């Protein structure tokens, strides 16, 4: 995909990579593996991805990671703190992730605890709406979700 990625970026479009292999696949494809083994697999995937992006400027790259957009209990989702270092190793500047569904809404605290490990160039893009619910969140709640991350990274 290296050539395709480079062609997309040369045309002036930012490249967003949707990577279910970094979170969702933990409880779908690799459910029989230990968390430690899964993290090794995720690091290998990230290394290969970063190699394929070698010739692309980080400001043109976005990575989207999620645990699946389905209405289910999500009790087997890998916590973000376990894959945090993998995500921070992404070559690109932009990191998009879920932060509003009931299973992951608390994980802003992990970003706060680990804020010193967030690279200076990393731009966090938290998902501030729950796409698995038919409830419409109040604008004040959405504002609070955004402010939590602004207070962590200061931007």
Predicted regions, residues:
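Domain-level signal for soluble alpha/beta catalytic cores
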Residues: 1-155
């Amino acid at each position: 995909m290296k050539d395709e990625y480079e062609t997309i970026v040369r045309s002036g479009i930012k490249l967003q990579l949707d990577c279910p292999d970094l979170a969702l696949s933990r409880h779908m494809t690799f459910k029989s593996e230990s968390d430690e083994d899964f993290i090794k697999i995720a690091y290998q995937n990230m290394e290969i991805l970063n190699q394929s992006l070698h010739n692309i400027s980080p400001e043109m790259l976005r990575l989207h990671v999620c645990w699946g957009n389905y209405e289910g209990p999500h009790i087997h989702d890998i916590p973000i703190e376990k894959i945090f270092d993998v995500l921070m190793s992404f070559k690109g500047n932009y990191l998009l992730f879920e932060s509003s569904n009931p299973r992951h809404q608390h994980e802003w605290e992990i970003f706060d605890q680990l804020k010193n490990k967030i690279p200076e160039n990393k731009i966090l893009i938290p998902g501030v709406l729950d796409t698995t619910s038919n409830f419409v969140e109040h604008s004040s709640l959405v504002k609070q979700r955004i402010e939590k991350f602004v207070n962590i990274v200061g931007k």
